[in-house]
């Protein structure tokens, strides 16, 4: 799963793409070729960020549930394997 550095990278990319889209819209209008291209690329970045956030929430949710239910391996229940025995 992606970490916070991936989230930060995506947020920076989203902000940069948004600025490019706004600049293109000011120069070419809302239906200009570059405006639409930047808008579509921005949509992809936002979708990627949203998917990453959902994956992180799911992963954290599963880990929290496992710990809450006491299913996390404990040393007293599952001692370390000793190959010499």
Swiss-Prot record:
Q: How is it modified after translation?
A: Probably degraded by FtsH, the last 14 residues seem to form the FtsH recognition site.
**Which keywords describe this protein according to UniProt?**
Hydrolase, Sporulation, Transcription, Transcription regulation
Please tell me whether the keyword Hydrolase is annotated for this protein.
yes
The answer to whether the entry has keyword Transcription regulation is yes
- Which domain of life, per UniProt? Bacteria
Kind of enzyme, top EC level? Answer: hydrolase
Matching Pfam families: SpoOE-like
User: Which biological process, per GO, is one annotated for this protein?
Assistant: regulation of sporulation
The entry's stated outcome for residue 40 to A is: Impairs sporulation inhibition activity
EC number, as in UniProt: 3.1.3.-
InterPro entries referenced in this protein's UniProt entry, alphabetically: HLH_DNA-bd_sf, Spo0E-like, Spo0E-like_sf
* Record-annotated membrane-spanning stretches: none
- GO MF annotations, alphabetized: hydrolase activity; protein dimerization activity
- Which pairs are disulfide-linked? none
Query: Family per UniProt?
Result: Belongs to the spo0E family.
> What other note does the entry give for this protein?
Mutations that block the onset of sporulation in Bacillus subtilis are called stage 0 mutations, or spo0 mutations, and at least eight genetic loci have been identified in which a mutation can result in a stage 0 phenotype. Stage 0 mutants lack the ability to form the asymmetric septum characteristic of the initiation of the sporulation process. In addition, these mutations have many pleiotropic effects on the synthesis of a variety of transcripts by minor forms of RNA polymerase in this organism.
Q: What does this protein do?
A: Aspartyl-phosphate phosphatase which specifically dephosphorylates the sporulation transcription factor Spo0A-P and negatively regulates the sporulation initiation pathway in order to control the proper timing of sporulation.
Q: What interactions and quaternary structure are annotated?
A: Interacts with Spo0A.
The identity of this protein, by name, is Aspartyl-phosphate phosphatase Spo0E
* Organism name: Bacillus subtilis (strain 168)
Q: Which gene encodes it?
A: spo0E
């Amino acid at each position: 799963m992606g970490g916070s550095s991936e989230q930060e990278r995506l947020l920076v990319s989203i902000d940069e793409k948004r600025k490019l889209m706004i600049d293109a819209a000011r120069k070419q209008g809302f239906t200009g070729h570059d405006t639409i291209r930047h808008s579509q690329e921005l949509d992809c970045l936002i979708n990627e960020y949203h998917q990453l956030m959902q994956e992180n929430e799911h992963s954290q949710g599963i880990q929290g549930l496992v710990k809450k239910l006491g299913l996390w391996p404990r040393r007293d229940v599952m001692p370390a394997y000793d190959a010499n025995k």
